[in-house]
């Protein structure tokens, strides 16, 4: 499937339906912020990335890595692609780029969302060949079982398979088990059954931080060869 056929892999700016220009203002701020920073890690994605920055665990785990947070609420894969093609990677040379996006790709199939994520990985590989890419798996959503939850699960399976054996990209299923045995998700973990609470962010961020440290150590020749996380 080519980018022309797949709307999820066609770089597209957000339509400013509210008329206040906030999305473009954030994009310009990210480009400006990158000009005088030397991050080891860059996070890019939707509100799950954006809101992480407000949690204490960000300051505990990721600030020491001089991490930049380029998350914008509501973004889909096509919006992240546009941002990356328009300056957000130009002035930095991170060692790792963390990508967490796809749950907002409403109206796109699991295959299309996967194509969008693969396009992001390819673009980062082209623009930042020294960097590894870590793709975080999409989380379950909704208090009760629903089609979007199933679609996110399918995306994760497809992305995991697509990145298997990739020399510079890694898939991490960061879900610690948010779905309970009765099929429900607790508001203690996801306060609106989509966005993570501080409690919900903790296991996700600790699993990610562990992987980031392993990757950074491996690139510095201090670690054993990385084994991909088991399905």
From Swiss-Prot:
GO terms for biological process: lipid catabolic process; lipid metabolic process; nervous system development; spermatogenesis. InterPro entries: SGNH_hydro (IPR013830), SGNH_hydro_sf (IPR036514). In the adult, expressed in brain, skeletal muscle, kidney, thymus, spleen, colon, testis, ovary and peripheral blood leukocytes. In the fetus, highest expression occurs in brain. GO terms for cellular component: 1-alkyl-2-acetylglycerophosphocholine esterase complex; cytoplasm; cytosol; membrane. Beta subunit (PAFAH1B1) inhibits the acetylhydrolase activity of the alpha1/alpha1 catalytic homodimer. Disulfide bonds: none annotated. Gene3D superfamilies: SGNH hydrolase (3.40.50.1110). Its EC number is 3.1.1.47. The modification Phosphoserine is found at residue 2. It catalyses: a 1-O-alkyl-2-acetyl-sn-glycero-3-phosphocholine + H2O = a 1-O-alkyl-sn-glycero-3-phosphocholine + acetate + H(+); 1-O-hexadecyl-2-acetyl-sn-glycero-3-phosphocholine + H2O = 1-O-hexadecyl-sn-glycero-3-phosphocholine + acetate + H(+); 1-O-hexadecyl-2-acetyl-sn-glycero-3-phosphate + H2O = 1-O-hexadecyl-sn-glycero-3-phosphate + acetate + H(+). The modification N-acetylserine is found at residue 2. The active site is at 47, 192, 195. Keywords: Acetylation, Cytoplasm, Hydrolase, Lipid degradation, Lipid metabolism, Phosphoprotein. Belongs to the 'GDSL' lipolytic enzyme family. Platelet-activating factor acetylhydrolase IB beta/gamma subunits subfamily. Alpha1 catalytic subunit of the cytosolic type I platelet-activating factor (PAF) acetylhydrolase (PAF-AH (I)) heterotetrameric enzyme that catalyzes the hydrolyze of the acetyl group at the sn-2 position of PAF and its analogs and modulates the action of PAF. The activity and substrate specificity of PAF-AH (I) are affected by its subunit composition. This is Platelet-activating factor acetylhydrolase IB subunit alpha1. It comes from Homo sapiens (Human).
């Amino acid at each position: 499937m080519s980018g022309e056929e797949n709307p999820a892999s066609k770089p597209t700016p957000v339509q400013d339906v509210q008329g206040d220009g906030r999305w473009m203002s954030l994009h310009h701020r990210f480009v400006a912020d990158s000009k005088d920073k030397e991050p080891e890690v860059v996070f890019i994605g939707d509100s799950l990335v954006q809101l992480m920055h407000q949690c204490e665990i960000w300051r505990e785990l990721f600030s020491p890595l001089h991490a930049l947070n380029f998350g914008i609420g509501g973004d889909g894969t096509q919006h992240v692609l546009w941002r990356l093609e328009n300056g957000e990677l130009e002035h930095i040379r991170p060692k790792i780029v963390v990508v967490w996006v796809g749950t907002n790709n409403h109206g796109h199939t699991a295959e299309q969302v996967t194509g969008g994520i693969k396009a992001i990985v390819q673009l980062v590989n082209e623009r930042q060949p020294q960097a590894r890419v870590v793709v975080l798996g999409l989380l379950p959503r909704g208090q009760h079982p629903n089609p979007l939850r199933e679609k996110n699960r399918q995306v994760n399976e497809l992305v995991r398979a697509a990145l298997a054996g990739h020399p510079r990209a890694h898939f991490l299923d960061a879900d610690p088990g948010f779905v309970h045995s009765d099929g429900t998700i607790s508001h203690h973990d996801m306060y609106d059954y989509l966005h993570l609470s501080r409690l919900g962010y903790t296991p996700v961020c600790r699993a990610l931080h562990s992987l980031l440290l392993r990757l950074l150590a491996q690139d510095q020749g201090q670690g054993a060869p990385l084994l991909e996380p088991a399905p």
